[in-house]
Amino acid sequence: RTGEAAGISGIIMSKDSADIYNPKVIRSTMGSIFRVPFAIVDDLAAAVDTLKDNGITTYAAHLKGELYNSGSLTKDCALLIGNEARGLSEEISAKADKLIKIPMHGKVESLNAAIATAILMYEAAR
């Protein structure tokens, strides 16, 4: 539902992502799952290649990236976000046009995926 609120045009998920048909997941989307197009793909690397082939700039959230606000996220972009436990695979990270990160203070190493995604989606929507 945060994606819908931020104005995203769709979601691409790998087949090993959370089960979007789980009743708790459906309820948590407050109906957004029925309004925002999504695709579940067998080959995420191929999906990233297809995005890039169609002129979509890809940004991967990565601890080794540049600060997300040091440049401009373009309107036609895709945000690549890893899961809570492992982050993005090196294969997917390497395919990104740019690695980006959110600045951290204190001893915190990372934000949870939902919060990080929300920050980046709203930056892309500016």
Each language-model region and where it sits:
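RNA substrate-binding interface of SAM-dependent RNA methyltransferases
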Residues: 1-64
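Structured adenosyl-cofactor binding patch, chiefly the S-adenosyl-L-methionine
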Residues: 2-6, 20-33, 90-126
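Generic hydrophobic alpha-helical scaffold/packing signal
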Residues: 39, 45-48, 52, 65, ...
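Short flexible/disordered coil segments
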Residues: 53, 74-83, 119-126
